């Protein structure tokens, strides 16, 4: 996705793998990037030559950073009225080119807000909505992405720590040491995590004379989801798409939501806008698009929407365990008792 933001633009290249591993390919973990692990059915394309050409004579060269990810050598932003083409030459010499793409329009997000709501499945939670107005050009088709950041507070945390000095684990008959309880030097009770969206959220105002977006939900979070336990922030991006790009993502979303491959409603084929330069027939997946981006950030606390209510449960089971202070000398030559679990404090 190329944008009108002045930034380092990025192109991702990979190849599909015919191998199917039902265990690894059907198990999703939101905290592990999909597609870049050795056992995923995706092989990143390395060593390629990548550039973007504008019909106004501009040329932007990309250099591979991490494997399969190519970054523009300079920051640039797409311009209205200019059509762009992505050109790729693989390390084996095969050349690909995209159809011409250009900005269709821009928009302005006028409001991002959260309301307590109930989902279609009856779950109590928070709905995050967007209102926007059209800007330049034709703004009728939209895609939404977001980055959410949330505060994590460790439930069992102490402001003190152990300080161990003069420790001799091999002393006989018992280890020798000095152990003090001191204030904790590192404040690690509170931390923050940021997660990017992994769903396809679309909206269309085609047929609406005003082209305004009103109360478009981009995220729903269940009331028991710990990410809203304390402080929560979401940066919403609204991408103005072309009709073709909107159709592509709509079909892709249909595939991702089709739970039964034998259901009566079958998603259509996914057509890419990239092909081989030599005209040879080859299935190419993916889509190069040019979008106008608008963004806005929202903050809220759990108390803002659920005043006086109990916080969501912490996602991990934490329990207090008692450990012995010392241990058997490492140089003890007699019968060895079973190791303690958890290990001793001084270990």
Predicted regions located by residue number:
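A sequence/structural signal for flexible, mid-protein segments enriched
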Residues: 1-347
């Amino acid at each position: 996705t190329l944008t009108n933001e002045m930034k380092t633009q990025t192109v991702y290249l990979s190849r599909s793998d015919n191998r199917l591993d039902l265990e690894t390919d059907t198990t999703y973990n939101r905290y592990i990037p999909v597609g870049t692990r050795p056992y995923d059915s995706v092989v990143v394309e390395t060593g390629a030559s990548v550039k973007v050409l504008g019909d106004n004579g501009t040329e932007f060269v990309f250099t591979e950073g991490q494997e399969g990810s190519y970054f523009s050598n300079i920051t640039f932003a797409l311009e209205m009225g200019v059509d762009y083409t992505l050109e790729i030459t693989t390390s084996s010499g095969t050349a690909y080119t995209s159809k011409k793409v250009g900005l269709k329009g821009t928009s302005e997000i006028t409001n991002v807000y959260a309301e307590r709501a109930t989902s279609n499945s009856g779950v109590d939670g928070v709905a995050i909505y967007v209102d926007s107005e059209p800007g330049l050009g034709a703004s009728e088709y939209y895609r939404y992405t977001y980055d959410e950041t949330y505060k994590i507070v460790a439930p069992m945390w102490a402001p003190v720590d152990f300080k161990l000095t003069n420790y001799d684990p091999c002393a006989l008959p018992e280890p020798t040491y000095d152990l003090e309880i001191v204030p904790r030097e590192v404040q690690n009770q509170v931390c923050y995590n940021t997660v990017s969206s992994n769903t396809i959220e679309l909206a269309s105002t085609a047929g609406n004379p005003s082209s305004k977006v009103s109360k478009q939900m981009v995220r729903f979070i269940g009331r028991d989801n710990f990410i809203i336990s304390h402080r929560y922030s979401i940066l919403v991006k609204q991408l103005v798409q072309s009709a073709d790009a909107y159709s592509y993502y709509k079909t892709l979303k249909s595939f991702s939501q089709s739970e039964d491959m034998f259901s009566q409603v079958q998603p259509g084929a996914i057509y890419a806008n990239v092909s081989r330069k030599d005209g040879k027939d080859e299935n190419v997946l993916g889509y190069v698009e040019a979008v106008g981006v608008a963004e806005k950030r929202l903050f809220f606390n759990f108390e803002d929407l659920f005043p006086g209510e109990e916080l969501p449960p912490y996602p991990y089971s934490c329990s207090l365990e008692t450990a012995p202070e010392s241990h058997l000398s490492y140089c003890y030559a007699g019968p060895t008792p079973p190791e303690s679990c958890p290990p001793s404090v001084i270990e």
